[in-house]
Amino acid sequence: MSRIVCKWIVLSTALLAPAASFAQVACTRDGLQAATNLYIEAQSKGDPSGMPLANGLAYIENMQVVDIKSSVIQKPLKIDFHRTLIDPATCQTFTEVIVTDKSHPYVIGTRLRINHDKIAEIESLVTQDGDWLFNVDNYYKWSPAEDWGVVPPGQRDSRDTLVAAANAYLDAFLEKKLDLVPWGYPCNRTEGGIRTGKGVPEDSCQVGVPSGVNIVARRFIVDETMGAVVAFCTFGVGGLPDTHIFRVEKGKLRFVHTLTHVPEGRQVGRGGQGRGRGPNNEK
């Protein structure tokens, strides 16, 4: 009982005075959740000064190093929904953030990496109007309604299983070996704001998978408790910055979310350098 009380006090103090006590819980699940809470608060206020940032912080947006002073985290955003994956094994988190503000909507995927008592990296995949199939109203309609809840301990897939499922899906984009992907049913894939499913048991994530697209530079954040894995990657070497977020149940894919940034002037649909077509054959 005393350990529970002590842990609660430490976490409460971390949220109120992060620089002083964050180190005590930094790479535990609770500590990483506390770091995420600080990020959400910072993004809501447009002020990261309350975050325990490392002196040599790496701040990255759409796979480009940028000055945090001119970044999206400096903009106060009204966050309508967020969902977080926590990876204690690598001391990282990933948070999907949805902002439906009509004046400037966003869907953002943010990775935090903690180094001892400091946030050493903040990497955001920032999507907005003009990015791949972007439609925040649709994304907001579907994402919060999906079940990404905690998987019971006896039913959790291993880290290797989760990463293997993600890799099999991403590998299929090159040679279209769809039989090697652990498809689950029903499964729904959301790309930007387009969805494959129709709300029936036969819904499939297999619809509209392209070929000839080499998805490279993959980096994974894995949450076994949630049965989820996210891949930061690009469509071809130097291609479009992307995240794929997967929910896996009993080794099978159930949900896939895709955020893809299209740099100004970049065309899509050109094999390895492009994005192929959307799930319902959109360009």
Give, region by region, the residue ranges found by the protein language model.
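Bacterial N-terminal signal peptides that target proteins for export
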Residues: 1-10
